[in-house]
Amino acid sequence: MKEFPMCPDCAKEYYDPATRRYDAQPVCCNECGPEVYLIGREERGRDAIIYTRRTIAEGGIVAIKGIGGFHLCCDATNEEAVKRLRELKKRPAKPFAVMAKDLESVKKECLVSEEQEKILTGHQKPILLLDKKEDGEETLCESIAPGNPKVGVMLPYAPVQLLLLSLIHISE
């Protein structure tokens, strides 16, 4: 956390043994902590999240820095966006995984057993290969997993992903 020097209020809590944040490395607040921003743009914080979400909704592709590196993201219901992502990645047929907002969203498209539900919602947040419902809402485009009866699904595991997905239905 060297890159984020603490403000006086956070430093006070960090060095006071009587507080719950005593000697906790990630102590920070909106004044001194990390922030969400876009490279090459002025938006910060919530505005950056809204701009990114709008870009995805309009068929754009964005790179999102997460815990384990970068991942490319587009709207999995937009056939043209997914095809463009396939071209960029030079990945003509290998299935893509999708990130769903929540378990309810997954269940609209896929069959989910109790065991799969536990795995999907567990703390590890793996990509789980699930059977597509024959009578599902079919909002995912075919290009996600061409000719495949299964789709790789995961739930958000990083704060930035949760923020992006929480704004899906917010009127902008």
Task: Identify the function of each model-found stretch.
Residues 18, 71-75, 154:
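Glycine/threonine-rich flexible loop motifs
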Residues 69-139, 143, 148:
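A phosphate-binding glycine/aspartate-rich beta-alpha loop in the early core of alpha/beta enzymes
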Residues 1-45:
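Cys/His-rich short segments
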Residues 45-56:
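A short, well-structured juxtamembrane/interface segment
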Residues 56-58, 62-70, 74:
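Glycine-rich N-terminal segment of FAD-binding domains in flavoprotein oxidoreductases
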Residues 31-38, 65, 140-148:
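Gly-rich Lys/Arg/Thr-decorated short loops/hinges at beta-loop-alpha junctions or inter-strand turns
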Residues 165-172:
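Residue-level detector of conserved catalytic or cofactor/ligand-binding positions
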